[in-house]
Amino acid sequence: MANYDVLKVDGSKAGSVELSDSVFAIEPNKDVIFEAINLQRASLRQGTHSVKNRSAVRGGGRKPWRQKGTGRARQGTIRAPQWRGGGIVFGPTPRSYSYKMPKKMRRLALRSALSFKVQENGFTVVDAFGLEAPKTKEFTKVLSNLELPKKVLVVTESEDVNVELSARNIPGVQITTVTGLNVLDITSADSVLITEAAAKKVEEVLG
């Protein structure tokens, strides 16, 4: 267990929180992180590519010329692959690129990504945002007070409408909850800003 500073939205220290080393201070497994990122990117692919084979191309139902006696090569349809306008051989068809990763590997990838951010000083814990209404100006001020870089992943314990609406128009800022936390978002951000309650929830889920 290690202590992490908990900051207020004005940048001052509010206290500290003790978090498990098994979640936030392990030796990052880069291979597992790489596999998790590949899995997510594969799942994001649409896979709607499609071409027509010889049976799907319109026309070509009639034999272009008789089988024998013309001196030309035998042909059965003008929609065969060797003809202009013919079907495509072994072309791409709609498919899903997603695949599965064992649960233990997924959890290890998340712990590794979080630990990597902690090692790189890209992990900040805040007590709470306490926004009473959606205000982009107020949220921008919070990021400035905490001296965070431009690309920030904000993690809340559950959906916070005020935080989401306040941050959605700020370039480089992404909002997620503990249940939506993933390796691609963590590694893409320069810094992770997480509430104390969310950090405890992550520890509970991944610990």
Swiss-Prot record:
GO terms for biological process: translation. Residues 60-71 have a biased composition (Basic residues). Residues 48-75 are annotated as: Disordered. Pfam families: Ribosomal_L4 (PF00573). The keyword ATP-binding does not apply. Disulfide bonds: none annotated. GO terms for molecular function: rRNA binding; structural constituent of ribosome. GO terms for cellular component: ribonucleoprotein complex; ribosome. It comes from the Bacteria. Keywords: Ribonucleoprotein, Ribosomal protein, RNA-binding, rRNA-binding. One of the primary rRNA binding proteins, this protein initially binds near the 5'-end of the 23S rRNA. It is important during the early stages of 50S assembly. It makes multiple contacts with different domains of the 23S rRNA in the assembled 50S subunit and ribosome. Forms part of the polypeptide exit tunnel. Belongs to the universal ribosomal protein uL4 family. Part of the 50S ribosomal subunit. This is Large ribosomal subunit protein uL4. It comes from Staphylococcus carnosus (strain TM300).
